[in-house]
Structures are given as C-alpha cells and as structure tokens.
Amino acid sequence: MAVPEPSMPLSRGGPGSASLSPPRGDRTLLVRHLPAELTAEEKEDLLKYFGAQSVRVLSDKGRLKHTAFATFPNEKAAIKALTRLHQLKLLGHTLVVEFAKEQDRVHSSCPASNAEKKKRLDDTVENDKEKKEPDVLTVENGIAPNHGLTFPLNSCLKYMYPPPSSTILANIVNALASVPKFYVQVLHLMNKMNLPTPFGPITARPPMYEDYVQLHAPLPPTSPQPPEEPPLPDEDEDLSSKESEYESSDEEDRQRMNKLMELANFQPKRPKTVKPRHVRKKRKIKDMLTVPSPASQSLHPVLLPSDVFDQPQPVGNKKIEFNISTNVPAALNKDLETEQNNEEKNSDSPDTGLDDSNTGFGKLFPKPNVNITEEIKEDSDEMPSQFISRRELEKGRISREEMETLSVFRSYEPGEPNCRIYVKNLARHVQEKDLKFIFGRYVDFSSETQRIMFDIRLMKEGRMKGQAFVGLPNEKAAAKALKEANGYVLFGKPMVVQFARSARPKHDSKEGKRK
C-alpha cells in the first residue's frame, strides 16, 4: 500500500517532543486512531509496510480501541516509521504515533495477533502430519471409499493364494455366471492385459499345476458360525457316531469334487436358436370371404362342402309336357306334332325363338325367369374371381329406412349419369385395393380398353380426405355400380355413391343447346 509521506515531519525539538523521544533501547510504537473501516489484517499489513517486524492489533472496544503496537527490528527503524506515520491522514482519520510506555508494554508482550495464532496452529498441524507414520493409509486411500469402505487397509495383511486347480477354476466360473458385474470386470481386465477375447471357440486346456504336483485336499464347505454360548454336549454321545460323521463328510467332499471336475471338463452346449416371433398380419376382405383350407396335418379325412351340404340342382329350361287323352280332335293332333318338332329344333339351337306363324292352341311353356338366370351366371362367374359378389353387396348394404335416419343421406341426389362415380364417407382404413375389390366387378379385365378406363383415385390427405373417384368403362356400368354399392358398409361406415359432376365438359352441353 503506497502511502504519501507528510510534507513536514515533526522535529524532536518542537512541541510534544517529549512523547516522541524514544527511551534508550526502545523499538515499540503505539499507533492510535486507526480507521475503523480497516480490518485487523489490513491494519497489520499497513504497519508492516512501514517496516514493523511484529504487529499486535487491539480490539475495537475499550480504552485502547483502534490502536496497535508495532515492534521494529531496531530503534533507528522505529524512529523512521514514527516520522512517516505521525499526523498522517488516512480515510478521514489522523494517526497519532508515539513510543510505547512501560505500562503499555504489558499489552504488547501478549501474542502478536489472531492471524499469527492461526499461522502457528497451521504450522503445528502440518508438523504433526509430517510426524505421522507413512505406513498407515488415510481414509481417502482406504479400501473403497466410493462404496462406503472408508477404513484403511491393514498393513500387516498379506495374501498368499493357492495355485489354480480345476476346483478353484470351476468355482470362479460359477461366480462369473452368477454375478454379471464380476463377469464385466473380468472382461475389462482381460482387455487391459491384451489377452485374447473369450468370445471365440473353446481354446485348448493348458497344463495344470495339479497335473505335476499333488495338491492338498479341498477345504470343506464353510459352516455357519456357532452361537456365542453353545449348548453343552450330551453325555450319551459316543465316539463312534463322531467318527461316522467325519467319514460321511469326507465322502460328500469327494463326490462334490468329482462333480466339479465333470463340470469343469464339460463342454458347453450350443445356444438354442430362438425363432423370430411371427407377427400376425391383418386379414384382407377377400381373405375373410374365402373359406380357409383345412390343415393338411389333421388326422381326420378332408370333407368337401358337397359331402356336408345338399347341392342345389342347376336350374334350367325344363320340358313341360301335357298328357292329352286319345279322344283329341285330329286338328289338335297335327298341332301337337308340329309343336314337338319345333321343340326339338329349339333344344338343338337354343338361340332361335318360337315361331309365331303357327296357328292353333299349341303347348304352353313357362316364361323363363331372366333374373334367376342372370344371378346364376353372375355368381358362377364370380365364384373363382377376386371381386365381391352381388349377394355380399346386398348383405352389406343398409336399408332405405336407415338411410333416411343418417345425416349423410339426407340431401342425397344421384346426379347426372356419366362413366365416373364419386364415393364419400369412407373410413380412414380404406385403401385403393378395397375399392378395386368392390368396383372391379363392373369391369371386364379381359378387354384392354375397359382395363385402361378403369381408374381409382382415393384422397387420403387434405380437404378431400375420405373421398374417392372411380372411373368405369361406360355409363351403364357406372349406373349399376351406383345402384348396388350405394349404402354398402365398408369398415363400419356406409358409402355414399353418386355420379361425378366433372365427368362431362361444359362445351358439350352448349353445343347441344345450339343444335
């Protein structure tokens, strides 16, 4: 700390020189009015800066508050410090410095300061640490302080392990298998020692110590510790029973040794290959409709549907004959003969129609049911196909009463007929293959033109999500699809089928109006 010297130091001959004149051989100064803002250490540093050898700072209370005793190495240094410090202004306080009197020397003879006390204590502690025995380990260097084992190692403890044997190695292997952390630490140690990894095939057995030198018998298994006050033995116990117990324990030890030797020499089995878990896929609609084939490994004979259910007889044009009595007029007989001839011709060529030019009563034939024949043809065509049948469409459709209750069908209008249909109210699980499974039945895939015109566009994102446009070959197929598929429940939601609005361009309608 740089302190400016006073411009005019007091001379000894001036006023107050009696207090400044030092007694012979005195080298202790009394410094008064030290600033209260300074700590004891700062006051001590201030006086040592002016050459003090030892400083004792008094307390801030009492008669000698804010004072300090400074001892210098000689009288000349004390006089020089007095001339520099006396009447020095420091932090608004004027210092007053004088030589200590005999009555004040009692205070200065006490220990120098608290800081010196601390230093002396630290020095003594360090000396005590140095005097400690170097063999005894501290707590920080104990067995395992990270795991709570803070006590030091015993310096007298020394280990002398027996040479490796098959029994010891077998016990180590069992410990490795039962303690995973021990197994990991052994692998770490092998890695640090640059040993070959144990993950390959089984290595050759090295020569063992016990093959050349006969080792001592294995130690018996450790028994639980006896109680502090064991019960007294009975007087009736014989020595023969004790001897038999010792013999049986020796036999058990031998059997245990043999088992351990077998385990040590036993080669491990190959690990079983775990089959990957089969994830069951979601069944498609066409897979759910087809009947699953029976398992080939079953012991029961395979039954066909024809063996279990009665097969319906194929419906065809049956011949209806009338048995007319013999007393029929001759004119009717001629008509019957001509009708029979026509019937035979019709059976040979079914495409030819009935001759309307024949006169007479003739035979009465039933009107063929066109709807039944169409259904039979459609069902027979679609049995092996990959599209839905009309019966399944009818079963899956909701009724007209249900359509009236649903808000989706309230303002329903089929629209202007064209070859494209618009489908809405589709579930989020619906895919293009599901729509193809339904509307593909109205397309003849053998025709390349119809196959090209058949188009499905399913909207999966945005504002049009859950809607689709299906392009069919012609208006007739589109009208049929609208009639049969409207209201069909697909994934729990009924479809709303309409004719698409943008199918026909606007200029066609204008040209039609001009014409």
Swiss-Prot record:
GO terms for biological process: mRNA splicing, via spliceosome. Its main location: nucleus. Disulfide bonds: none annotated. Residues 115-133, 337-348 have a biased composition (Basic and acidic residues). PROSITE patterns: RRM. It is found in: Nucleus. One of its GO terms (cellular component) is U12-type spliceosomal complex. GO terms for molecular function: pre-mRNA intronic binding; U12 snRNA binding. Transmembrane segments: none annotated. Residues 27-102, 419-502 form the RRM domain. Component of the U11/U12 snRNPs that are part of the U12-type spliceosome. Found in a complex with m(7)G-capped U12 snRNA. Interacts with PDCD7. Participates in pre-mRNA U12-dependent splicing, performed by the minor spliceosome which removes U12-type introns. U12-type introns comprises less than 1% of all non-coding sequences. Binds to the 3'-stem-loop of m(7)G-capped U12 snRNA. This is RNA-binding region-containing protein 3.
